[in-house]
Each structure stands twice: as structure tokens, then as C-alpha cells.
Amino acid sequence: MSAAPGLLHQELSCPLCLQLFDAPVTAECGHSFCRACLGRVAGEPAADGTVLCPCCQAPTRPQALSTNLQLARLVEGLAQVPQGHCEEHLDPLSIYCEQDRALVCGVCASLGSHRGHRLLPAAEAHARLKTQLPQQKLQLQEACMRKEKSVAVLEHQLVEVEETVRQFRGAVGEQLGKMRVFLAALEGSLDREAERVRGEAGVALRRELGSLNSYLEQLRQMEKVLEEVADKPQTEFLMKYCLVTSRLQKILAESPPPARLDIQLPIISDDFKFQVWRKMFRALMPALEELTFDPSSAHPSLVVSSSGRRVECSEQKAPPAGEDPRQFDKAVAVVAHQQLSEGEHYWEVDVGDKPRWALGVIAAEAPRRGRLHAVPSQGLWLLGLREGKILEAHVEAKEPRALRSPERRPTRIGLYLSFGDGVLSFYDASDADALVPLFAFHERLPRPVYPFFDVCWHDKGKNAQPLLLVGPEGAEA
């Protein structure tokens, strides 16, 4: 039996334009297309020079496309069959086979391969199938909409990737640039110090060398005198011996002490590298925020200076708190005027020898009335000192987490906040040239937040020391 009528036409049709092949080419995966159709659909080659097969998505090289002469000859032969007639029997295609979804002639339907199939007159099949087109069109439109959304999402993600990479490269370049500037300045400073030491040591050593050479010359002269005296007659020998030996003893007594030069240069060790890292850490911090305390938020017992950069707890009886929800009525605390909501920020607070305090940030929506529960879930991220020696982080727990006691109690605290990285870090900033990490919260903070300062109760004068905000010119006295 020959192939079913219509199936040959289907097999010789391009899967892209659904028409008979025109200049058919075959890809490496085995699928065939009109050359023009493939060029239109495949688009520009990828980085490796390949295009994707529209049927199976397999990569194929455009230069490997081969003209399919056998297909071309079959198409040419099929084109000679009158349109609407069976390729095998040349009879009109008047019957529709539902089972094979193909038009067939009467001979194929009654005697050929479609005998016994579900068959309909072509006119009836046309009317029935035409009613199904709107539903199929709707399905096609819905599929297009879904794919268009997918395309939009991918295009947006592509833009996001480009922007993320651009920002990453910018941040890397900026930070590494700062590191290079810092290290170049440090290298220059150390080189100048080494040159200074070399110069001073050279002058001192040359001075010592001149003195020693002069003394050595005296010793050699005395050696010659002794040799001359040894050859003298008895009387002259005895007369000169006492003079010569007396002079020799005087010269020996004036012997210059051995040179002792103390060269003061840093020892290049792991500790040196650690010190450089700490100094570089400070150099990479953003510029100091110029914060001021917000008096309207301060507990009634707190006194804020006219400059807004000094706050202390008064030992005088405080008036009752007002009704302003922005004011702390139980916690002896205050926030900064400035709210922070994006980017990087760094500020410093002089705590001096104050034995109790807490610093950090508070969410703008966090309550300020009543007793504060100082944990992140309540909008507070704090580091504090108690009893003058115990640093503690106010983490999500019943009690604050006590940290390892530092070698020395910090007198100045540095706080670094990065919304992009989701980090709030605390540092011992007592050394003007270096920062020592103390603790860090790693989480995405709500926006905005306010710098928070818990001055704590004065404790009958034991904790009366102020908190001072540090500006570019230093802390207020």
C-alpha cells in the first residue's frame, strides 16, 4: 500500500511556513526547513557560532547546513500533481479521515489504507472543524501572552544582571582604589621613615667612625713611641718610660665606648600586617555622619547641649514625660535627628569611662513609650556596656549575649551600617588610626532607622558621664 494521500504533502512541508519546501536544507540534528525560513527564525548565531534548531533546540552550525536535493526533487514532483487531488490516484480529495486527520480520495477511502477509518465528507468536515478555530486561536493567544510575559521577565532579569554587575564592578573598583591609595600612602610614609632612620643612623655612625679612627691613630702612634723607647739606652729609657706609660694609660682611659645604635623601625610580622589591616579598615569607612541628638525624643532627665552633640543624664528630679509618642518616657535614651534609609553610614560616639551605655539603631516604627525590650524583633539592634567591663550584644534572647571582654575598655565606639549588605557593625574606635571589630548584626534592617543612644540612669553620679557625638573636627568637649 502506498502512503496515505496528504501525508506525503505533510512530510514535504516546512514545519515553519507549513508550505512545500523551497530550497530545503537539513540541520545537523536531521530536521529540514526552507533555507529562508530557517534564516528568519534562527536569528543571529550564539557566541560559539551556532544557531538553535526551531524544532528540537539542538545547536547546529550554519556552515554545516546541507541542501537536501532529494527533498527538492520530491517537492518538484509533488508540485506537478493538480492541487486538491490524490498524489497516488489523481482523484479529487473529497473525503476527510478523522483518524489520520487527512484529506483522501474515494479510492483511498474504500480500498486503500484508510478503509475502515472514521470518514466524513470534506464539506461536513470543513464546517465542523471551522467551528473549532476560535478556541484554537484563543489557546494560541493565551500561549503567546504567557511567553510574552516570560520574555518580559527574562529581559528584566537581563537588565538587572547588567545593573548588578555594573554596581559590583563599581564597588570593587571604588574599594580596591581606596585600598591602593591607602597602601601607597602607607608605603610612602614607611619609606620616608626608613629614609629618616637611615639618614640619622648614617650621621651617627659616621661620627662614631671618625672618632674611632682618630683614637685608633693615637694608639698606633703610641705603639711606635713604645718601640722607639725600647731601643733607648738605660738612662734615657728610664727617663722616658714613665712619661710614655703615663700618657698611654691616659689614652686607654679615654677609650670611647662601643657604638650602640637603636634603630626604631616596625617589625614586619603577622602583628604588623594585622595593624595595617586595622588602619586600612578605618580608611575604607565612609565619611563620618554629622549627627545631632533630637531633644524632642529625649527622656525628660536627659540634657542635650545647644550644639546637639552632647547628652547627659541630670541628677535633678526630672519632670514627667509629655504625651509625644516620639519621646522616651521610661528608657533614658535619645535618637538622632537624622533618619537613615539607604546606602552606607558610619558614625562615632565618645563613651569615655562611662560604665553603662547602649548604642545602635531603632526602627522608625518601633515604640518608644514604656519599658523597651531591646531585641531585633522589637526594632532595636544594640551593643552595650554594663558594670564598666562587660560588653553585651542585645540579640534575640532572654538576656543579652555577653561578649569576650576586650583587652581595654573602649572609650569611643564606631558604628557602620550598610543597607545593601544588611550589616550593622560595632568597632572600638579609641585609636584614631585603627578600628577593632567588636560585634555585628547580619540581617536586613527595616527602613528607615534612627541612630539610638541609651545614656542609662546616672546611678547617683556613678554613671553621670555624657555621650558625645564625634564630628569631622572631633568630639565636643
Curated annotation (Swiss-Prot):
Protein's gene: TRIM72
Record-listed Zn(2+) 1 binding positions: 14, 17, 34, 37
Name of the protein in question: Tripartite motif-containing protein 72
SUPFAM superfamilies: B-box zinc-binding domain (SSF57845), Concanavalin A-like lectins/glucanases (SSF49899), RING/U-box (SSF57850)
Coiled coil spans: 135-232
Gene3D superfamilies xref list: 2.60.120.920, Classic Zinc Finger (3.30.160.60), Zinc/RING finger domain, C3HC4 (zinc finger) (3.30.40.10)
Quaternary structure annotation from Swiss-Prot or TrEMBL: Homodimer. Homooligomer; disulfide-linked. Oligomerizes on the phospholipid membrane. Interacts with DYSF and CAV3.
Phosphoserine: modified positions: 255
Effect after changing residue 198 to E: Reduced cell viability upon peroxide and saponin treatment
